[in-house]
Design a protein with these regions (language model features):
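Electron-transfer interface patches adjacent to heme c in soluble/periplasmic c-type cytochromes
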Residues: 1-123
Length: 123
């Protein structure tokens, strides 16, 4: 399913894509075309998983799983799947971007964050 017409700003999304793959470092884990790194595990049958500390997520949710870790969520059609994060703790894409900006000390400006959100809405 495609995004509804006019649901994101194309110019801002283009700037956001550059941030996603550059200064924001999102593309190091969220790799196209699915925007996930789950297939980059040690072998074809073992997904790549992350400790909660790597992502800044609450470890309580991961500790209830068999692996005690998180997988990188694919971002395709992300605009359809609010709330975000494994526990639904981020109500908006803005909250997601703010979380990672803080956790990774990225220092993104308000305009950069807005562009990044527009890119995420375009996936």
């Amino acid at each position: 399913m495609s995004q509804p017409a006019g649901s994101f700003n194309a110019g801002a999304a283009t700037r956001g894509q550059a941030l996603f793959n550059g200064a924001a470092r999102c593309g190091s884990c969220h790799i196209a075309p699915s925007y996930s790194d789950v297939h980059n595990g040690p072998d074809a049958n073992t997904p790549l998983l992350h400790d909660a500390s790597e992502t800044g997520m609450d470890p309580a949710y991961a500790l209830r799983t068999a692996t005690k870790k998180y997988r990188t969520t694919p971002l395709r059609a992300l605009w359809q799947h609010a709330p975000y994060f494994h526990d639904g703790s981020a109500a908006t894409l803005e909250a997601v971007v703010n979380h990672y900006d803080g956790h990774f000390a990225l220092g993104l400006t308000a305009a950069q964050k807005a562009d990044l959100v527009e890119f995420l809405k375009s996936l």
